[in-house]
């Protein structure tokens, strides 16, 4: 990536980066003596953020020096010299150059410009490690000589090893040849910003240990799915199941379908899964056996296609019914004349029809009461649960579904002295009147 630095400023040793200038040898020598080595003063056509590997290899023959005190200090800490690492150079005059650049690009006030010598090319302490996993990064910065005073204070223009530039999209991760990302603080910046910067030659090699992206590349949880099918010849005690293990649901289902259920030649469609509650009762068709086996394997191959729902189903019919909750479709209308109730599935309509036919197929096993809807039976069962625990039972609301059969074993009204003093005939009249009042409007009944 190339940056245009604007017009020329020969007084501080900066020429136009877009095009090179020609100077006499005397001018160049005089400027080098007075200002120190400035790699951007002459001959460098542009300011490149990350030089390629062949440019780094020839760094000793360019404006960069091969070694300097900054690199020697890093070597004393245990770093080894590699040809790909850039040495240091004198930065006394170049500091004023970068001070101007930060002022010109709008990088902040004078304090920010004064600390710019640690911001553009120096990472925050401990932010980057060397190529061998070292945490001290002084010897592996882009320009290590500028890092000698960076440990004293943090720069506002470097965020966890990121170089901040004064234009849109100004967060750029450092290239891999100057040290890999090891600090977890830099993950918030490096991971989202790395995409779309291919021309910058940013290389984040995955074989250098844990980096900024590895927390987002978690390994899938390994699971073992065991086949518990018992072959008919293995039914004799002790029963021996298949016990083959699989890592994916697809492999388990394929194994059961091919190896155990069989093809069209099988006439008996019996589930031999271990502890199956059907106990050898056959199915009338193979597809029914296949659907039943999903109860044992846990396979649910039919996901809801609506975004954000996430529900999955073992049978396509259940998915079809479920999708009506999203669409609001209710194709099943009550067939009783005068009732305009509609339902999403036929089973709910069938339960509702008991209201009109006065059928009470849902019987209480603890008393003689019966109900037209299973929800009413569930409410009634709470009365028995509370009475068995010794608490005072609350009267159960009839909701139009309670049977008018006189209570025989347990009745909520037995604890009420006023109700218990009534004769059976008056009690029956009371229930009949209640039913006639509730039957005036079918549409108000809860189903």
Swiss-Prot record:
Listed Pfam families: zf-C2H2, zf-C2H2_15, zf_ZIC
Keyword Lipid biosynthesis in record: no
SUPFAM superfamilies reported for this sequence: beta-beta-alpha zinc fingers
One Gene Ontology term of the molecular function aspect: RNA polymerase II cis-regulatory region sequence-specific DNA binding
Keywords for this protein: Activator, Craniosynostosis, Cytoplasm, Developmental protein, Differentiation, Disease variant, DNA-binding, Intellectual disability, Metal-binding, Neurogenesis, Nucleus, Repeat, Transcription, Transcription regulation, Zinc, Zinc-finger
Localization terms from the record: Nucleus; Cytoplasm
Cellular-component GO terms for this entry: cytoplasm; nucleoplasm; nucleus
Domain comment quoted from the record: The C2H2-type 3, 4 and 5 zinc finger domains are necessary for transcription activation.
UniProt disease link: Craniosynostosis 6: A form of craniosynostosis, a primary abnormality of skull growth involving premature fusion of one or more cranial sutures. The growth velocity of the skull often cannot match that of the developing brain resulting in an abnormal head shape and, in some cases, increased intracranial pressure, which must be treated promptly to avoid permanent neurodevelopmental disability.
Subunit structure as annotated in this protein's UniProt entry: Interacts (via the C2H2-type domains 3, 4 and 5) with MDFIC (via the C2H2-type domains 3, 4 and 5). Interacts with GLI1; the interaction enhances transcription activation. Interacts with GLI2. Interacts with GLI3; the interaction enhances transcription activation.
Family: Belongs to the GLI C2H2-type zinc-finger protein family.
Protein known as: Zinc finger protein ZIC 1
């Amino acid at each position: 990536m190339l940056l245009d630095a604007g017009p020329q400023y020969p007084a501080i040793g900066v020429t136009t980066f877009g095009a090179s200038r020609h100077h006499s040898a005397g001018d160049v020598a005089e400027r080098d003596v007075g200002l120190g080595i400035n790699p951007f003063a002459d001959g460098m056509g542009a300011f490149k953020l990350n030089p390629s590997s062949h440019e780094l290899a020839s760094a000793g023959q360019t404006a960069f020096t091969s070694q300097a005190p900054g690199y020697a200090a890093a070597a004393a800490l245990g770093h080894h010299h590699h040809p790909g690492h850039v040495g240091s150079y004198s930065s006394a005059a170049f500091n004023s150059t970068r001070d101007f650049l930060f002022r010109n690009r709008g990088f902040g006030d004078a304090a920010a410009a004064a600390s710019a010598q640690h911001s553009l090319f120096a990472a925050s302490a401990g932010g980057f490690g060397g190529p061998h996993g070292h945490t001290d990064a002084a010897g592996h910065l882009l320009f290590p000589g500028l890092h000698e005073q960076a440990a004293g204070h943090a720069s506002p223009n470097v965020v966890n090893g990121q170089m901040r530039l004064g234009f849109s999209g100004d967060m750029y991760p450092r290239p891999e040849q100057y040290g890999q990302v090891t600090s977890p603080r830099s993950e918030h910046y490096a991971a989202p910003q790395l995409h779309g910067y291919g021309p910058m030659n940013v290389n984040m090699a995955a074989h250098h240990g844990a980096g900024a992206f590895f927390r987002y590349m978690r390994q899938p949880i390994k699971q073992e799915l065991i086949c518990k099918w018992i072959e008919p010849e293995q039914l004799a005690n002790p029963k021996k199941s298949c016990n083959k293990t699989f890592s994916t649901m697809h492999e388990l289902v394929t194994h059961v379908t091919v190896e155990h259920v069989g093809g069209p030649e099988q006439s008996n469609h019996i589930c031999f899964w271990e502890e199956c509650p059907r106990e050898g009762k056959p199915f009338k068709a193979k597809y029914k056996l296949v659907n039943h086996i999903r109860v044992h394997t846990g396979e649910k191959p039919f996901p809801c296609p609506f975004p954000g729902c996430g529900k999955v189903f073992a049978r396509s019919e259940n998915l079809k019914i479920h999708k009506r909750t999203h669409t609001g479709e209710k194709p099943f209308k009550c067939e009783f004349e005068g009732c305009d109730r509609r339902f999403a599935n036929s089973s709910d309509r069938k339960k509702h029809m008991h209201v009109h036919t006065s059928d009470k197929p849902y019987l209480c096993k603890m008393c003689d009461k019966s109900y037209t809807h299973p929800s009413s039976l569930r409410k009634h069962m709470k009365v028995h649960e509370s009475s068995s625990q010794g608490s005072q039972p609350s009267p159960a609301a009839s909701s139009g579904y309670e049977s008018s059969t006189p209570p025989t074993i347990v009745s909520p009204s037995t604890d009420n002295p006023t109700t218990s003093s009534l004769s059976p005939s008056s009690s029956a009249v009371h229930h009949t009147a209640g039913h006639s009042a509730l039957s005036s409007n079918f549409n108000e009944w809860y189903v």
